[in-house]
A protein has these predicted regions:
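Short, well-ordered alpha-helical
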Residues: 3-134, 161-163, 485
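Residue-level signal for inorganic ion chemistry
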Residues: 14, 77, 90, 257, ...
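Short helix-loop capping/hinge segments that flank enzyme active sites or metal/cofactor-binding pockets
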Residues: 56-60, 64, 105-125, 280-282, ...
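Short glycine/serine-rich loop/turn segments
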Residues: 84, 104-246, 288, 401-420
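Active-site-proximal gating segment of KS-fold condensing enzymes and close homologs
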Residues: 416-428, 432
Length: 485
């Protein structure tokens, strides 16, 4: 009996009514063969399982507030959104805008990812499997932003149910990358990133399960911040994988993200968070897995950022993380179990409503053993302990956001150096580990390739040290070619 027949038989035993899809399941499992092989070979550690716990964000110790220079014309932003319908950046634009509060984002237009409740707007998650039901209330994070004065001008397009990295949406169309139209905008928060990169809005809300804020930020040449796990409330936001999901700000630069983060924390004002220099800061540049392989132009950008950090007073040290190569396998088993469990009822009732790439990934989750999920959480605990130990030695980690700049539209595999990767692996290799650990991480726009494609770099810190991450990233941003352009 071959694998397809075995899976079909098992699916029938489970009561799954679509055993005829066994060939698609086998093909999808084949795409994850490297992760599955690595996971099987890894011994199960004698360690407790990882527990995703909320994080308290430490107060900033900065010298002054950054000036984000945010525009305040929401009506003009809505007009721009309608004019740029070719980008497919939005799933919904309202006929009229709701007035907001008079806080730190007074009058600032924002886009909200179509994965969360916005009162009076229809939530769809970008899927035909969701009826477009008008939200009766705001998600808590949206309510906080409205209290701070932000004006929601629309719902941003995304990869269906936030489960993918291309933002090629089966219901609302493929999001176009304004910075490089022949390249993917990243996902899953592709519409949020595109709306900022096109100058429609200065700020947007995204979610991040394996890089879904930081990857689109890097692809589109903007900034995207994934805060510490559960530092921000996820009430009123659809889950993908509960222990990996984060919500956070996206903006043109680090200063924008900091202003929006303050509003998301429900602070009355943007606190003093910036630094005069990087004196006394220890930066760990990660090698090994994080540099082999690496696109040549991404390496040049990383070298330049490392030099900039040192010239600004930072002490730069070189470090590796033992066992980091298992991060993708740990994430595969975690997200597959949690996402399939969340979608089980809807998938059974309306399977045809899902796009093929998301449907097959959710179906694949039925076939990964429960024991693998537990093993993954034990391995996750070990990995988190190692990275936490490193962040007691260094203040932040400095790495690229992706191994290479945004990939061409339609590409399913990526050749980087002498290695061939499935697209999702190539894109999330450097972002996914920090969803596993719940650590704050920001992708900042650094430079562009010879072809004009944006290159982003990532700064990562210890849980609760979100403002330190933002402050250090802001100093690096000031030295970047992007800032000088």
């Amino acid at each position: 009996m071959d694998l397809a027949q075995a899976l079909a038989g098992y699916a029938g035993w489970l009561g799954h009514g679509h055993a005829d899809r066994a060939a698609a399941w086998v093909a999808r499992l084949g795409m994850n063969a490297p992760e599955i092989d690595a996971f099987r070979a890894a011994p199960t550690p004698d360690a407790p399982v990882y527990q995703a716990m909320p994080t308290r964000v430490d107060a900033p110790k900065g010298v002054g507030a950054g000036d984000a220079h945010l525009p305040t014309d929401a009506i003009e932003a809505l007009r721009r959104a309608r004019q740029r319908a070719d980008l497919n950046a939005f799933t919904y634009l309202p006929d009229r805008l709701e007035p907001a509060g008079r806080g730190i984002l007074a009058g600032v237009p924002i886009a909200v990812k179509d994965l969360m409740l916005v009162k009076g707007m229809p939530i769809t998650a970008g899927s035909h499997a969701m009826d477009a039901q008008v939200a009766p209330r705001d998600a808590e994070i949206v309510a906080r932003l409205r209290r701070a004065g932000a004006v929601v001008i629309g719902l941003a397009n995304l990869h269906e149910f936030a489960y993918g990295i291309t933002s090629d949406n089966p219901r609302f169309g493929r999001v176009v990358n304004p910075a490089a139209p022949s390249r993917i905008p990243g996902g899953s928060s592709g519409g949020s990133a595109a709306a900022i990169a096109a100058g429609i809005v200065p700020l947007a809300v995204g979610t991040d399960t394996a890089g879904s804020i930081r990857v689109p930020a890097a692809c589109c040449g903007i900034a995207g911040f994934k805060p510490s796990y559960d530092a921000l409330p996820r009430d009123g936001i659809l889950d993908l994988a509960f222990s990996l999901d984060h919500v956070g700000p996206m903006g043109r630069n680090v200063d924008d993200c900091a202003a929006m983060f303050a509003a998301m924390l429900d602070l009355p004002a943007v606190p003093k968070w910036t630094r005069r220099d990087l004196g006394g800061v220890k930066v760990a540049r990660l090698g090994g897995y994080f540099e082999d392989p690496l696109d040549v132009e991404v390496r040049v950008a990383l070298d330049a950022a490392t030099a900039a950090a040192a010239s600004d007073g930072a002490q730069v040290i070189a470090r590796d993380i033992e066992g980091i190569e298992l991060a993708a396998a740990i994430r595969l088993n975690t997200i597959s179990a949690e996402a399939t469990a969340y979608h089980a009822g809807r998938l059974e009732e309306r399977p045809e409503g899902y796009g093929e790439d998301v449907r097959v990934r959710l179906e694949m989750g039925m076939f990964l053993p429960a024991s693998w999920y537990v093993k993954a959480q034990r391995l996750r605990r070990v990995l988190a302990d190692r990275i936490e130990a490193l962040l007691r030695e260094a203040d932040v980690l400095l790495i690229p956001t992706m191994r290479a700049p945004a990939r061409p539209v339609g590409e399913m595999r990526a050749k980087i150096g002498d290695r061939d990767y499935a697209l999702h692996t190539a894109v999330t290799d450097f972002t996914g580990p920090f969803n596993l650990t719940g650590m704050p991480a920001i992708s900042l726009p650094w430079s562009r390739s010879r072809d004009g494609v944006p290159i982003g770099l990532q700064v990562v810190g210890a849980r609760g040290r979100d403002w330190d991450v933002l402050a250090i990233a802001q100093r690096l941003q000031g030295a970047s070619p992007h800032a000088r352009a």
